[in-house]
């Protein structure tokens, strides 16, 4: 069951000197990134250009759009298309061949049948595709983690089209199912020969302001039926009410699966513990993997601006945004370990994402 006291206390103490300012800074960064994405989608420009117009117009979208469309066509100082060196998700071709790129996943395409092992593993990770800075190197960093850990399933959030194309080319031993094809979206990767795809469903969140939904994928693992789910719930404290409604939808969908189906949800929930309490807590038959394992401190915070400076937020904020929920017949699925990944800086000096990834291993008891 969800326990709010310890996490709430930790959140209220971060940072101790000025919690209000820290939260405002955090929300502002996320809001502006989403605002830049929306501007880019409307204007078909790069998000770096979008951010420039918005910042020069005090982040007033209508004013920025007017400035963009009213600029002279020969104004070379403000190209609609970024220069070829721009590190933008819309224009950096992540699929280009690179002779030095060793991140192609070359494990056996047939995989190892689950019947030979009672352990499954998966990664859940918000890979921050909306950040165009150093995107090719960060994408290679993510693929390096996939190659290193070779999980059976990967749950991803904040995937963009060019990033998805890169994954399809580099992660050849995985089938990739996405929650959308435009803007930014979620994806679930299934190891070929190990996880058999049976079907998918996308559940819309009707009141989302951020293009969010719930991606459900039905699979077979060693003869056992699984329903795998991922989502990127509404961001920032301002949208707490919508986030709680989305969480209720997740729990409702988890309950709809047949009793013999094991359900795993893993994703970026953006949750604060008090919101789980406001939602009524976890259903009696749904468990939080981190809590099940005794709330290990080493993997508590998946979004930590003090340890991870990708966003360059001055204040220190840390949250357990990325969570894993599971529902299984009693004793049939037992979490064994949970660890953070993506903790090492890349050559560019940044991390693969502003979120740490979670690597989870579980025992399947037949």
UniProtKB/Swiss-Prot annotation:
The known PTMs are summarized as:
Ubiquitinated by TRAF6.
Annotated site residue numbers, Interaction with 5' end of substrate DNA: 184, 303, 321, 355
Enzyme Commission identifier(s): 3.1.4.-
Cross-referenced InterPro entries:
Endo/exonu/phosph_ase_sf, Endo/exonuclease/phosphatase, TDP2-like
Ribosomal protein listed as a keyword: no
Which CDD domains does this entry report, sorted A to Z?
TDP2
Q: Name one GO cellular component term.
A: nucleolus
Q: How is the cofactor bound?
A: Binds 1 magnesium or manganese ion per subunit.
PTM Phosphothreonine: at which residues?
95
Active-site residues per Swiss-Prot or TrEMBL entry: 268
Gene Ontology BP term (one): neuron development
What's one GO MF term for it?
nuclease activity
* Compartment(s): Nucleus; Nucleus, PML body; Nucleus, Nucleolus; Cytoplasm
Crosslink Glycyl lysine isopeptide (Lys-Gly) (interchain with G-Cter in SUMO2): position given as 30
What is this protein for, i.e. what is its function?
DNA repair enzyme that can remove a variety of covalent adducts from DNA through hydrolysis of a 5'-phosphodiester bond, giving rise to DNA with a free 5' phosphate. Catalyzes the hydrolysis of dead-end complexes between DNA and the topoisomerase 2 (TOP2) active site tyrosine residue. The 5'-tyrosyl DNA phosphodiesterase activity can enable the repair of TOP2-induced DNA double-strand breaks/DSBs without the need for nuclease activity, creating a 'clean' DSB with 5'-phosphate termini that are ready for ligation.
For this chain, the family text in UniProt reads: Belongs to the CCR4/nocturin family.
Q: How does it assemble?
A: Interacts with TRAF2, TRAF3, TRAF5, TRAF6, TNFRSF8/CD30, TNFRSF5/CD40, TNFRSF1B/TNF-R75, ETS1, ETS2, FLI1, SMAD3 and ACVR1B/ALK4.
**Protein name according to UniProt:** Tyrosyl-DNA phosphodiesterase 2
């Amino acid at each position: 069951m969800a326990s709010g006291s310890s996490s709430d206390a930790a959140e209220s103490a971060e940072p101790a000197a000025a919690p209000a300012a820290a939260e405002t800074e955090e929300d502002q960064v996320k809001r502006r990134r989403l605002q830049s994405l929306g501007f880019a989608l409307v204007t078909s420009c790069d998000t770096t250009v979008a951010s420039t117009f918005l910042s020069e117009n005090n982040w007033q979208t209508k004013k920025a759009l007017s400035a963009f469309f009213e600029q002279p066509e020969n104004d070379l100082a403000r190209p609609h298309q970024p220069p070829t060196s721009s590190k933008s998700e819309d224009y950096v071709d992540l699929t280009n061949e690179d002779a030095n790129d060793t991140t192609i996943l070359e494990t056996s395409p047939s995989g190892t049948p689950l019947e030979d092992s009672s352990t499954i593993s998966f990664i859940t990770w918000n890979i921050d595709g909306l950040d165009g800075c150093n995107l090719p190197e960060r994408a290679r960093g993510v693929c390096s983690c996939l190659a290193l850990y070779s999980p059976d399933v990967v749950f991803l959030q904040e995937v963009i089209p060019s990033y998805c194309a890169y994954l399809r080319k580099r992660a050849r031993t995985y089938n990739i199912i996405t929650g959308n094809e435009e803007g930014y979206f979620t994806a679930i990767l299934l190891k070929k020969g190990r996880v058999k795809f049976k079907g998918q469903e996308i559940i819309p969140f009707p009141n989302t302001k951020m293009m969010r939904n719930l991606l459900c994928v039905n699979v077979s693992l060693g003869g056992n039926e699984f329903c795998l789910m991922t989502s990127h719930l509404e961001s920032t404290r301002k949208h707490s009410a919508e986030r709680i409604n989305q969480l209720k939808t997740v729990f409702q969908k988890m309950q709809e699966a047949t009793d013999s189906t094991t359900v795993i949800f893993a994703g970026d929930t953006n949750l604060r513990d008090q919101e789980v309490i406001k939602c009524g807590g976890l259903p009696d038959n749904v468990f939080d993997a981190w809590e099940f394992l005794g709330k290990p401190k080493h993997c508590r915070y998946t979004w930590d601006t003090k340890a991870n400076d990708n966003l360059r937020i001055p204040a220190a904020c840390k949250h357990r945004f990325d969570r894993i929920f599971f529902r299984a017949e009693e004793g049939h699925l037992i979490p064994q370990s949970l660890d953070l990944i993506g903790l090492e800086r890349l050559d560019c000096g940044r991390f693969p994402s502003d979120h740490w990834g979670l690597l989870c291993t579980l025992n399947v008891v037949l």
